[in-house]
């Protein structure tokens, strides 16, 4: 599909996280550096400051924020002949971009690791649940391409760094959803020259002071642990205003209550206007997916 395309649009889910931005920029790097395609990554809304470093090193204008540059994004979607959707199982997760994407006559490819992929909307689907991240799934797909032939050192440097960054964020630095293939991916990329230490510094040692103070406030005053071992934290608008909260700064907070022996599941709710964004993590033997499907329509 990429071989027969001249103008490619890459899209990811709304409120993009590290895996979305990592896999999206990795695909962008592969298409532009290896396939010499005219390509752009379109994110529905802004990339959080905490992971914006992932987009550094990519050409100006190649990463488009739909809510900020709507006309430019619409032109890209309407004129492209291939759409690649990464890290989301349906166009419904692309917010205001959904209608444009569905109406497009371009061929469509899905690359994702979530449950229930909307395969009917795509010409080609790569879907695997037993894998750490969309970034890892994309890595193994790229390893099978004739340009790479299983040699990670042939990947463009910025593509390889994005892949390792995306996987690292989605596994919480190898804490969740890690498989033997995940370690093999990391090993190959590091052997190929990716600077993992630099990635970790950018991800985990580059926050604002307010984030640390917010974390302490939430854990001391907003954390509730039920008798059945479910922990939940609500980050309401008042607290967000108090600490000048920036989107993305609560990344990883949902994992913290799991350090308590009695906690089997952790739920983190973030107020956004008239809705709450929900993140769920659980320990082995307890299904976060089942909880999301039953109570949170996800």
Residue ranges of model-derived segments:
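Short, structured coil segments at secondary-structure junctions
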Residues: 57-58, 104, 120-122, 295
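Conserved beta-strand scaffold positions in the cores of enzyme catalytic domains, especially
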Residues: 41, 108-110, 125-127, 230-232
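Glycine-rich, phosphate-binding/catalytic loops in enzymes
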Residues: 27-28, 100-103, 126-127, 185
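Acidic active-site catalytic centers that drive phospho-/nucleotidyl reactions
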Residues: 17-19, 87, 112, 170
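Hydrophobic helix-and-loop "lid/oligomerization" segment in the mid-to-C-terminal part
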Residues: 1-15, 22-57, 62, 68, ...
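Active-site cofactor/cluster-binding pocket
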Residues: 64-121
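Short glycine/serine/threonine-rich phosphate/pyrophosphate-binding segments
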Residues: 18-24, 91-95
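Short alpha-helices
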Residues: 113-187
